Amino acid sequence: MYAILENDSDILAGKVFVNLSSDTPEKAREAAKWLTGHGASHLTGGVQVPPSGIGKPESFTFYSGPLDVFESQKELLEVLTSTDYRGEDPGLAALYYQIGMDMFWTGMLSYLHAVAVGKANGITAEQLKPHAISTMASLPQFIEFYTPRIDAGEYPGDVDRLAMGAASVEHIVHTTHDAGIDTSLPEAVLEIFKRGLANGRGGDSFTSLIETFMKPADHVIEPSRATTSHL
């Protein structure tokens, strides 16, 4: 964005810019502040589909920024996709987008790892497909069940226990190892479970790992910015 607009920053005043680039919420806020400082109006957008999905009725885009600006441009924006306005904070659209990408990439990576384990045991991706789809299709009911408990800060072990989940993940690590497949993904998952156990959460639900995520590990590696900035 800056590479395009900085050389013409003197003509930005009075214009409306919709930032559909993919970056962090903080970068989106910085972009909004920069544009506002030059007299322009700004909306952040988080497009939830690839280019092939543009113009299709089921596609949508998150938007955030000044409500009056969004309302004035809504009809034009809906030519691209349907719109989902998240709020005044210019970083919210990017935040919802990145949260979605968090779930997408971790979910798809688990699928690819499962396929690798299957292939090592003579099971094709096609043979695994209905079972993979069934497993993924079961997730909404868990999300529905756990959401009110999570919002209440309650993680009772009446349905599941973290210790039980840790044992299950350990079995996955051993199964992966026995198949001769890279174990780094399930080992990373097991490490998170172990941190929860170390925090005394063994008898609580595995959803108590939210509290573990809220306290980053001492060895967390600072993410590289080399490939993340598209503004």
State where each predicted segment sits.
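Amphipathic, non-transmembrane alpha-helical secondary structure
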Residues: 2-9, 71, 170, 207
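Rossmann-fold dinucleotide-binding core
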Residues: 4, 22-105
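ADP-ribose/adenylate-binding Rossmann-like module
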Residues: 10-28
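A short helix-coil junction within the Rossmann-fold of NAD(P)-dependent oxidoreductases
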Residues: 11-12, 34-35, 117
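Proline-centered loop/turn at the N-terminus of a beta-strand
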Residues: 16, 41, 60, 182-184
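Helical "substrate-binding/catalytic lid" subdomain
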Residues: 92-216
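Eukaryotic N-terminal low-complexity, Ser/Thr- and Lys/Arg-rich leader segments
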Residues: 223-231
